[in-house]
Amino acid sequence: MTVMRCNDSIRGALGRLILLAIGALGASQQAFGQTTDVIVIRGHQQIVHLYGRRGGDPVIVSSGDGGWIHLGPHVAEALAAKGLFVVGFDAKAYLESYTSSGSTLQPADEPGDYRVLADYAARGSGRKPTLIGVSEGAGLSVLAATDPQTKAAIAGVIALGLPDTNELAWRWKDSLIYLTHGVPNEPTFSTAAIAGKVTPLPLAMIHSTHDEFVPVADVQHTLQQANEPKKLWIVNASDHRFSNNLRDFDQRLLEALDWIARNQPR
């Protein structure tokens, strides 16, 4: 009888612990986990991935052309855990939505699309969002920040693994670049050619020492073409997405956000 009462007590305690764990997990997911929403940009529905609570300092994280995987979600989760409100944007899906047999995304239209994103992200906070882009998303973020109206709606740009050549379309056949590490056979734009137009907004770049897609020399060249305020952090990491040194990457990312805040146009 004593053993049975003991077992019942243990089971009861375990049950309470499980319920507490489930509750804690639910609260964590509510605070930092991903939910989704749909916004309409020039007649096209775009799914956005939301992390954190609206009202925190807003950021827009644009993915690479692989979609909402790897570094983009990592950045979103890390920043939401610090209290920021993150709008995750799938650059691959965005490009696909404007790609047809006869047309692609036009550079003149892209900044206005990001202005819609910026207005959405800023809602409820009264603060301008920072654009954070991964690879292709970094190029799109730089392009958006060259437009005077969009500049007025954002705080600056943090470019992660920024390539010089960025595509303006995406088709299934373009996935070959993941093997070749080349550039899709699509219309493109050069970030080095437009980086100087981001000023007076601050432009930060974070790059891996062993980026297999974008050599350090390429991002240094783009930095040279940009005007102040500008800054480059280089992280000792094994690949394009900093996969073996996310700890240092995360620290540099927080430093870049602080630097953006301290270098706002006067």
Segments from the language model and where they lie:
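Primarily recognizes the serine-hydrolase "nucleophile elbow" in alpha/beta-hydrolase
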Residues: 119-178, 186
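Short, surface-exposed "cap/lid" segments of acyl-processing enzymes
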Residues: 53-84, 88
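Histidine-bearing beta->alpha loop at or near hydrolase active sites
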Residues: 93, 235-242
